Amino acid sequence: MSFTKFCRGCGQTLQSANESATGYIKPLKLSGIFSKGSVSNLLKKNLDEQAIFNNAFKNLNPQIKKHFPNTTSFPFHEKEIGRTDLLWCQRCHDLKFHSRIRPKELLQEPQTTLPDIISTVNNDKSTCLIIQVIDVTEVIFQDFVSATQYTHFPVFHLFTHADVLPPKKPYWLFPGLGISSKYAMLYTSHSFNLVDKLLGRINPLLCSRGHVYVVGEANSGKSTLLKTLAKRGNGVFNELLLDSFLPGTTQAIKGYPTQYFGSCFKQLSEGLIFDTPGYRGNLKSLLPWVDTKLLTSLVPKTRSRNKQLTSKPVQYRVRFGQSIILGGLVRVTPFEINEDGNHEVGKPIMFKKEDPSSTTIHFLFSTLKNKKTKGNTNNMKPLLIKLFTKLPAHITSITKLQSLENSTKNDNVPLVTHSPSPMHSSFTVSIKPTQLSENVFDPTSSGELVIHNFGFLSFSASRPMNLLVESVNPKAVSWRSAKPVVPKFNK
């Protein structure tokens, strides 16, 4: 008897021939599964591995521990032996249970496009509904593309992260995008009432033995939506899906029976729900080189600047030419510029005689307090910073940003505001060491990059130098550099 071999996380077909290819799994796991005589040995091996995992899990930092389920990673019961749909490939297993990510995986950007996904859906004659998941914070009217342009199947548009919109419902959104409110809805996974409302809207569109495809850009919330539906219906999908804010986590189209979602899809008896890879959007992914041990810690937990100044901030060393990522979408890269202080954006950096790997810059990240959000309970949740090269549809005014500029004009600390370049989606700021006297400079160079309404990044260099800081520059917010206002780094 043969079994379908695919990863329960990313959906790729499991293989043990090429370690660098997707879906790789150690040969020992596959060879033991199909041998009846090795069932007892495999169970013992799983028990041993689970014991090791449990011991390691107990020693994790509580702040990191809450992001990972305390569950087994291999088939545990004898009746499940031989079911390879319960296995993880090496990549997904390392990401889910050990927070290990290989640099080459971080540098992958989504290559799939919306037409590519829809062409696969159109070839499935059993398709009854397409749910297009759109992050409402990334909606740009002139760039929005509906899946209805590529298919004759019904498309329901689900706009996620609606909790960041103004209190009044934006009735202008759907007409502005040219879609009917009958097939569109604002949604946030934090409300079960909206989950029930969503099910009430899509269930009439379903048919028995039909297929439902969930499509959307990378990190738009497709997997989170499916997990929320399973949780609402008392299903088991929450246990089977990989959860990560990294782009490209779902690497292949994968179907799940309606039983995984409990009582959610009543009209879809014996049908399938398909999770699809995130397609490439207008804003492309920004991916870093970052110590994976700090991958979770780099997401700030509070917007209160006062709390962060009295607590220990996140501190990280970055070599010149490397990047760090903030909240998943903002990249900041320090560069050393020539002695004459000139560097052309886009040109390669010519390092000095010193070994660049021996010179590091310290980065400290904190967030600013937002006075307008005192009653917002989401303030206590991790803040994912999202910045844009174009103004999102829900940001209609920059009055708050201008008033913030005016309020800082009389500050004792000199501030410099940098305007975005119309030719580039990034800009540069030059940080020079303080000159104490003629030919004598402060032994350290430090500064601060302020992101209005979002946060600030403090940095300190180990010797006098000029630094070039490159970052994505959104038109929705302004940036400025300043002298550091946070405590100095510990030597």
UniProtKB/Swiss-Prot annotation:
It comes from the Eukaryota. GO terms for cellular component: cytoplasm; mitochondrion. GO terms for biological process: mitochondrial ribosome assembly. One of its GO terms (molecular function) is GTP binding. PANTHER family: GENETIC INTERACTOR OF PROHIBITINS 3, MITOCHONDRIAL. This is Uncharacterized protein C2F7.09c. It comes from Schizosaccharomyces pombe (strain 972 / ATCC 24843).
